[in-house]
């Protein structure tokens, strides 16, 4: 793209601003945002988080309870941060969490094809109290809307 923009910092030094195409996402406050509203870069970033978590769980020497605890209280909340601004479909959420969920279930000595009713069911009905990220995304959007 022709031309460049510069910005002075508080010491007076000039810095050239990076120019991106409208479809390119740039990380802003931990979330990849593109000017045209596409979320391909953000989706890939979230998938990378899932793959990284799966790799760490797979090679760790943790117990089955610690693996499930880490998935529930560390990995899922790290995804929850961007839910109020993301607009992923249910299939996209499945592709994001699939590697992490599979590795966690394997480490917890459970079959990877365990029914979602058990995973996302409450402990009152012998479920694991995990939250479906697609449903959580909708709740986060509603909560943000109600705060506005």
Could you describe each region identified by the protein language model?
Residues 50, 93-105:
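Short amphipathic alpha-helical coiled-coil/interface segments
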Residues 1:
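Conserved polymerase palm-domain catalytic core
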Residues 5-91, 108-111, 139-148:
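Basic, alpha-helical interaction scaffolds
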Residues 83, 96, 100, 109-148:
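Extended C-terminal regions of large enzymes
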